[in-house]
Curated annotation (Swiss-Prot):
This is Trigger factor. The gene is tig. It catalyses: [protein]-peptidylproline (omega=180) = [protein]-peptidylproline (omega=0). Residues 161-246 form the PPIase FKBP-type domain. GO terms for biological process: 'de novo' cotranslational protein folding; cell division; chaperone-mediated protein folding; protein transport; protein unfolding. It is found in: Cytoplasm. Belongs to the FKBP-type PPIase family. Tig subfamily. Its EC number is 5.2.1.8.
Length: 434
């Protein structure tokens, strides 16, 4: 076998391989002998068909199979010998084959980039320092009460905390625009569902009133024909409702799994959940900064094949979230996922180099702790833990999570980490909008 390697462009490589004719003939003969033992041809007993007839009947297909097999096996041998690390599936380009002659073919593929980590000491990370206090728990309890609230009709003017039922007709320069009309539209104030100025125009009005408000569509509005336009909305306010919050009764509290139904028990449960969320938010905040710094400090070429693979994964995930199938996933524009896919590949390659350089292995104690932490959010944590322990794929996924955490900790040990005091609400709001 003769092998030559050339660089096509960037990470692209082409390996050209020549297989000796005698190697091909030897492999073909071996396969024909195997075939002769099992073929059935009228006039001959099984296993006693003359080789010349077997070759006449099956020679072409056997030879084709042998060439395909030799192409793959010799390519594997070649990349091992040349110490090449392909990224993605190779593309085989067969040459012209003539029986009894050497066979030359080429294989085109991309390789993984050579990664040399640098400037890790320049990475800057702000670590949030925050605790859950009583006021945070009070706010969360108020949120829980609002989630369980009922609505009661009122004759009072609408406020920023109320719910309104209304008809509206929107127009620009006197012309009603598409999507600008609605009947019995229920608007919960304060959720930011409408364009700026709409809710403010409703606040202060009572049920039964008819009025007009002037608003401006934002410059970045999703509908091209409405961007930056001034519009009028004729509104009929049919109903205003005020929110009635439930009292912290024993019955209400037990809905949240607090067996004794006490306010103290609910506060303790809420605090525990908030502290778990806080721990995860701090961890993710620090991790994101560390990885952002790693990516900024280390610009690398990315194999297109790996990016395409990630795009396919993201497409399928997006389709699954909205109840789609494989066909619908394939129809989603690749541009929607290209940037995210490229970043995932870059991060994977860089963290992989951190893991390799520092010879990191998944810490089984950390894996166990991660599973226990995740399971604590469920009604029966032990059942979840046992489910994971019996599922090899889930355990391997969790080991990968642990290994990634260990890689990030290695980065943090070299980075400039400063502590920044903050509050629970500030951190969680940053996490939501990030």
């Amino acid at each position: 076998m003769q092998v030559s390697v050339e660089t096509t462009q960037g990470l692209g490589r082409r390996v050209t391989i020549t297989v000796a004719a005698d190697s091909i003939e030897k492999a073909v003969k071996s396969e024909l002998v195997k075939a002769a033992k099992n073929v059935r041809i009228d006039g001959f007993r099984k296993g006693h068909v003359p080789m010349n007839i077997v070759e006449q009947r099956y020679g072409a297909s056997v030879r084709q199979d042998v060439l395909g097999d030799l192409m793959q096996r010799n390519f594997v041998d070649a990349i091992i010998k040349e110490k090449i690390n392909p990224a993605g599936a190779p593309n085989y380009v067969p040459g012209q084959y003539k029986e009894g002659e050497d066979f030359t073919y080429s294989v085109e593929f991309e390789v993984y980039p050579e990664v040399e980590l640098k400037d890790l000491e320049s990475i800057e990370v702000e670590k949030p320092v925050v605790e859950v206090n009583d006021a945070d728990v009070d706010t969360m309890l108020e949120t829980l009460r609002k989630q369980q609230a009922t609505w009661k009709e009122t004759d009072a003017a609408a406020t920023a905390e109320d719910r309104a039922t209304l008809d509206f007709t929107g127009s620009i320069d006197g012309e009603v625009f598409e999507g600008g009309k609605a009947t019995d539209f229920v608007l919960a104030m304060g959720q930011g569902r409408m364009i700026p100025g709409f809710e403010e125009g409703v606040i202060g009005h009572k049920a039964g009133e008819e009025f007009t408000i002037d608003v401006n569509f934002p410059e970045d509005y999703h509908a091209e024909n409405l961007k930056g336009k001034s519009a009028k909305f004729d509104i009929v306010l049919k109903k205003v409702e005020v929110r009635e919050l439930p009292e912290l009764t024993e019955e209400f509290i037990k809905r949240f799994g607090v067996a004794d139904g006490s306010v103290a028990g609910l506060r303790a449960e809420v605090r525990k959940n908030m502290e778990r969320e806080l721990k995860g938010a701090v961890r993710n905040r620090v991790k994101t900064q560390a990885i952002d710094g790693l990516v900024s400090a280390n610009e690398i070429d990315v194999p297109a094949a790996l990016v395409e693979g990630e795009i396919d994964v993201l497409r399928r995930q997006a389709a699954q979230r909205f109840g789609g199938n494989e066909k619908q996933a394939a129809e989603l524009p690749r541009e929607l996922f290209e940037e995210q896919a490229k970043r995932r590949v870059v991060v994977g390659l860089l963290l992989g180099e951190v893991i390799s350089q520092h010879e990191l292995k998944a810490d089984e104690d950390r894996v166990k702790a991660l599973i226990e932490e995740m399971a604590s959010a469920y009604e029966d944590p032990q059942e979840v833990i046992e489910f994971y322990s019996k599922n090899k794929e889930l355990m391997n996924n969790m080991r990968n999570v642990a290994l990634e955490e260990q890689a990030v900790e290695t980065l943090l040990s070299k980075a400039k980490v400063t502590e920044k005091p903050t509050t629970f609400s500030e951190l969680m709001n940053q996490t939501t909008t990030a």
